[in-house]
Amino acid sequence: MSRALDAECTAQKDPRNQKRYKVSSCDRISTQEGQYIYKAQLIVDEGEDPHFTDGVSFIFLTKEAPYSCEVVEFDYANAILFFSSTKLIFVTSDCRVISDATMNTIALKKLLEELSEYNINKSYPLYKFLEGSTDKLKDIKHPPYPSYLEKYFVKDKSQFSAFKASLDKDITFIWGPPGTGKSYTLAAIIMALHSMPGERTAVCCLSNVAVDQLLSKVVKNITVEEPEMKRGEFYRAGRTQDELLLRTDFLFPDDAISSKIRLMIKLYNKKLEGYRTANQQFSNEAIEIKAHLKDAREELKEHTDYLINKVRVVFSTISNFVINPRLKDGLFDNLIVDEASMLAMPQLIALARNVSKRIILVGDFQQLSPITVAGIPVLKNNVFKLCGIDINHTNHPALRPLLNQRRSHPKLVEIINKPFYGGHLMTDNPKYNSIVARPPYSECVVGMCSVTEGMVRFTKGGTRQNFANSEAVMHLLDLYNENEEDTFSIGVITPYTGQVSLLKALFSKREYSTDFQDRVKIGTVHTFQGSESDVIIFDMVDCSKFEKGKPYFGKIYANEQGEQLLNVAISRARHKLIVVCDPEYLKTSPGGSISDRSISIFNTLLKAQWTKI
């Protein structure tokens, strides 16, 4: 595994895989308490879709030296990056901003190398993953869980089966197809494990957003079932931006310092909301407040991190777990990992090496697999597959499938049910939603927006764009924006970063209200895994005409990866799916690498109502 991680690190350092942006200008806008705030104008090549998340580290490279910096804010429409540095930067010509993806890989490799110095305890559940014996389950004795949890599963036996197995066995795989209540079931499992005397549980997710979403469900349960929950039982490691969680007293110690920091965060957020309402969120004053807010969140994290070794349940991202000494060296009885279909074996070893009783892995192996640049099997195969679990092998004794789909309209479930889940999903969402009745595509759950005059062009970075498709998407958004009474969410999904960049550029030029902007999310399929929207607009991009050369489907649609992509894109929709594509191109499916399963999905979509625009 060490060699595989070395190869991954080398691939990540390759300039072709790094995110590097030239800087046309950089100005210092503020100096506060030994911290400098800068405003950099980036040169973003056509088709690039830069991502800069608040608080994330990056390298600002000048001719003189590299500087470690942190993101304060990013103005996507104008490609302006606001950032902080503890050092005064001597700006030179030919500066660059570099996103360094190797930090987590290096930390993971170092941790695994430390592990090689001693043997993992053979009584720990992780050992079974290493020797390939996860089918040999061990019974875990435990006291009764709170009786109120029984009512959570009155209507769903598959959820109760997963709940019981998670408590009774040392290893549990919970297979949760879209909309079957993974988070709902997990929240109950977490409550039950918390009730076990003396046991400590680590809960890990891929992203901060996912951590906050799951913790919010647990907090909601606690508010109803155990309103007198004392402090020091649950802790959210890392930095949260969720205001509800920041207001939840039992997640924080009862001391003057943390109370003061939380109050400051609340005040900063209130001020920033005022700037945003006035459309001045990128003013120098707002950026200074945002920098203070970032520092306050970091201060709160550092002040409260000691709780990791004291609380019963810790929530964290996977990357934070690997890097944070208190987490990676901590002793836990139980480990829960959400979205485990994107978890490879090296990450599991890092998370589970000190877990003594239970490993509970939750995810859908029919969705996206681990992200890797090097493409080495041990890094790209998820833990389900490495344990012999896939759609053709679902009889593993530790596997507990969730079968009742309650999120999406039955007609949407029909599209993915047979191809991806063998027809085992049962729909339990008969409620008619008014979104279906409204235009565009009134009374249609699935609509096909036919774009026959499109043309695929390749950007400098090799990604794809289709301007006609993007205009069709914007026309659909314009229609939804016209109805001011609507409050539902809209997701725009596309496989290519080049098309995301184009769509975001067009979206930023529209004079949509702040409320409508907040309700629309535009991104690649990967950015949507684990999320959902009332309406999904799926822009397929590929069509029968290329700017140069013979048309062919992009490799992202190929083979198993293409199947997973289609499954995720379609299953994000709760009530309505609109596919923007060239229907004739779907019928021919050129390229030779499109699987029969993907073609069957195309044929199902082609049966939907469509109109030319």
Q: Residue spans of the language-model regions?
A:
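Conserved helicase motor core of SF1/SF2 NTP-dependent helicases
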Residues: 196, 319-613
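Core residues of folded domains in eukaryotic genome-function proteins
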Residues: 36-38, 54-56, 65-67, 77-79, ...
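Beta-strand cores of modular interaction/reader domains in eukaryotic scaffold and signaling proteins
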Residues: 59, 70, 82, 173, ...
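Accessory interdomain/linker segments of ATP-dependent helicases and helicase-like nucleic-acid enzymes
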Residues: 1-63, 467, 471, 477, ...
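Conserved P-loop NTPase mechanochemical-coupling segment
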Residues: 271-313
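ASCE P-loop NTPase helicase motor core
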Residues: 71, 127, 131-252, 295-298, ...
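Residue-level recognition of conserved beta-strand edge/terminus positions
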Residues: 59-63, 317, 539
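Pre-ATPase regulatory/linker segments immediately N-terminal to the P-loop/RecA-like helicase/translocase core
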Residues: 23-161, 231, 242-274, 578, ...
